């Protein structure tokens, strides 16, 4: 199993400030998969309190991987736009409680969409 890897990734995510900020991808030469570095949190399912930033940043990492692999700069630009939207949202406290904001998961996602549309 990867139990110790899971434990270490959770601990390092906490050092970074929140499990909700630990982005990752599993990548090979042909395929990649975006996922937040931490496990599921069934105890908060459906409560609108989960931090979506780790999954959004994981998607950004996947876009970068694909853009580099295929030589497609527009995918890398999309990745940068996602990362910039997350950075700006955190600075404006448009985030969930674990990041110092007062928004729920849905509202945080909507704030990111507004920043991407601007």
Model-derived features with residue positions:
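Glycine-rich phosphate/pyrophosphate-binding loop and the adjoining helix
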Residues: 72-77, 81-118
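Glycine-rich phosphate/nucleotide-binding loop
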Residues: 1-81, 85-92
């Amino acid at each position: 199993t990867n139990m110790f890897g899971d434990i270490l990734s959770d601990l390092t995510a906490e050092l970074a400030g929140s499990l909700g900020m630990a982005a990752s991808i599993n990548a090979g030469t042909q395929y990649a998969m975006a996922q937040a570095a931490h496990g599921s949190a069934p105890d908060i399912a459906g409560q609108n309190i989960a931090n979506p930033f780790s999954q959004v940043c994981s998607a950004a990492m996947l876009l970068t991987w694909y853009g580099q692999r295929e030589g497609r700069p527009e995918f890398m630009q999309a990745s940068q736009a996602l990362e910039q939207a997350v950075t700006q949202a955190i600075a404006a406290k448009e985030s969930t409680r674990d990041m110092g904001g007062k928004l729920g998961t849905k509202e945080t996602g909507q704030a990111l969409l507004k920043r991407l549309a601007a």
